[in-house]
């Protein structure tokens, strides 16, 4: 997680400990949901923090942007903050890049939350909201995909085993070794996808 993410958790916790006496500006930085804290929206893209803010304000859920793979120390801060909010079970919805690395980050976040040192596997469920080609249709038009897709075969040969494994599951884009950055998606579509997912949990 990024430094800003940890600060948001820490400021939120300090606000709770001091009976909410910190300034409103800092209380608003807390990322733990005010109404449905156990519902967690996750993205790897720090540039989608605006979407996290939308999810939190519109739906009262917990929302975080990790800036890539999340470390166990940051996960511990996050877990502690959720436990202080009396969360015992967690449902996670993830929006990440449509590529091997986005899929891995989403999967690892869900798995880590289910570790026995945190909530335990039986208390965590999660889904990637843009894991398949069919999912992409909710985020992009065909023209946007064509413009935004990138050739994954151009990456280092050391990453090609990851590409092959991911391609075997997803079939890439139209049967080609392509991925796409999720933050290229239209903002309204991203908001609607969060709205759609929240209604299902």
Name each model feature, range by range.
Residues 99:
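Catalytic metal-binding/acid-base residues of hydrolase active sites
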Residues 1-90, 103-201:
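Nucleic-acid enzyme cleavage-core boundary/entry regions
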